[in-house]
Design a protein with these regions (language model features):
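Phosphopantetheine-dependent thiolation modules in NRPS/PKS and related acyl-activating systems
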Residues: 2-34, 40-45, 50-82
Length: 82
């Protein structure tokens, strides 16, 4: 999965969680910049799992609070074949 594909999945997830038509967030901006709180972040992980087919398990977005960091975690999962 390319970073652009993952980024698109995250943006789509944010739109679904927040009920928005569009989201503007840079790869290095925190998810709070897009208006997500801790509950929204948990829901975002679930949305991204559904879109990408990845299983993040008990992953907490506070450990990766930007698209760049979240993609790094996804890369670890892909490397392990998750």
């Amino acid at each position: 999965m390319t970073k652009e594909e993952f980024r698109n999945a995250v943006v789509e997830g944010i739109k679904r969680v927040k009920g928005l038509d569009a989201v503007a967030i840079a790869d290095d901006e925190t998810f709070t910049h897009a208006g997500l709180d801790s509950l929204d972040s948990m829901n975002l992980v679930l949305e991204v799992e559904g879109i990408t087919g990845l299983n993040f398990g008990e992953f907490n977005l506070s450990d990766a609070n930007t698209i760049d960091e979240f993609y790094g975690k996804a890369g670890e999962l892909l490397a392990r074949g998750a």
